[in-house]
């Protein structure tokens, strides 16, 4: 690597070098209709985005990634007649997938654990408590998946979930041009957002249904069941997700099969599920019919981690650690911290206390994470 007097540029060149090494050996995951999509990227050494890119082959995509070694790489949720046209109106919009973005730092479980940092190379940045926050975000992704499948009727094979490479998850429903939802504008997509968030849902709708006990002639409450429609069915499916995480098989059986047993434990799970009835998603991402989204298996330049596909069941045990970095096999890297962190933080499973001027040698994934965040540079 060439040495530069500018530590920031030298750091970015180093990150670009590592990124190129990754793209030389790896392949990103593209949708089958990628030739109808617009692509965009930002390099490690530039501030502006290179947009209006289109490709006719996967090899052309690979060549560009090796050449540019981009910090960020995106493709459009929309399909176009002319995706490479510079003018958006000239592209000829055809349709768009449904896209959802879940950010851990927007969730109530995470709000009290965010560490804000000023004075970094990239400006203000922040760190989250990874285990707590990402577990909460993973649960929201599972709840969203269940809504899409069991309430909105989308085929499981069309739904993809990815770790964003930073602090959340992307959920995409891949659609064809002829699908009504694919042609839907922002207004219809906003209605879907409101439905997912359970906006306007009356509290009484969540109350237990009752049945008349013939022998005693009095109503008894019926536990929520995953086969039910509407809000009660959603509550039951959330209970199932929570119980599966905890290994509470009796609770899973109670909401999956016909049951009139309303145990105290089930009531506790139901109380938790009611609080999760609305999924906190980024509305702007979902209503935008021309959204740029990160390409699976590309590098997220905010952290140096991969945009990693995960299955809905893998979310139960999802953790952010060094295995999510494409640089796990690189040798340790010495960095110089350029701004102090006000408290210790956990980065990829490593608990760190960093002060300005510190020069630790760290595992490559952790060092890259800190340099990408702008709180450290490559040491001389």
Curated annotation (Swiss-Prot):
Identify this protein by name: DNA primase small subunit PriS
What does the record give as EC number?
2.7.7.-
What CDD domains does the record tag this protein with? AE_Prim_S
Query: SUPFAM superfamilies in the record, alphabetically?
Result: Prim-pol domain (SSF56747)
Q: Does the keyword Nucleotidyltransferase apply?
A: yes
What Gene3D superfamilies does the record point to?
A: DNA primase, PRIM domain
Q: Which GO terms describe its molecular function?
A: DNA-directed RNA polymerase activity; metal ion binding
Q: Where is the active site?
A: 101, 103, 282
Task: Choose any GO biological process term that the UniProt entry carries and state it.
Answer: DNA replication, synthesis of primer
- Cofactor(s) needed: Mg(2+); Mn(2+)
Its assembly, as annotated, is: Heterodimer of a small subunit (PriS) and a large subunit (PriL).
Q: Which InterPro entries match?
A: DNA_primase_S, DNA_primase_ssu_euk/arc, DNA_primase_ssu_PriS
The gene designation is: priS
Q: What GO terms fall under cellular component here?
A: DNA-directed RNA polymerase complex; primosome complex
Q: Which family does it belong to?
A: Belongs to the eukaryotic-type primase small subunit family.
Q: Which organism is it from?
A: Hyperthermus butylicus (strain DSM 5456 / JCM 9403 / PLM1-5)
Instruction: Give UniProt keywords alphabetically.
Output: DNA replication, DNA-directed RNA polymerase, Magnesium, Manganese, Metal-binding, Nucleotidyltransferase, Primosome, Transcription, Transferase
Q: Name one Pfam family in it.
A: DNA_primase_S
Query: What exactly does this protein do?
Result: Catalytic subunit of DNA primase, an RNA polymerase that catalyzes the synthesis of short RNA molecules used as primers for DNA polymerase during DNA replication. The small subunit contains the primase catalytic core and has DNA synthesis activity on its own. Binding to the large subunit stabilizes and modulates the activity, increasing the rate of DNA synthesis while decreasing the length of the DNA fragments, and conferring RNA synthesis capability. The DNA polymerase activity may enable DNA primase to also catalyze primer extension after primer synthesis. May also play a role in DNA repair.
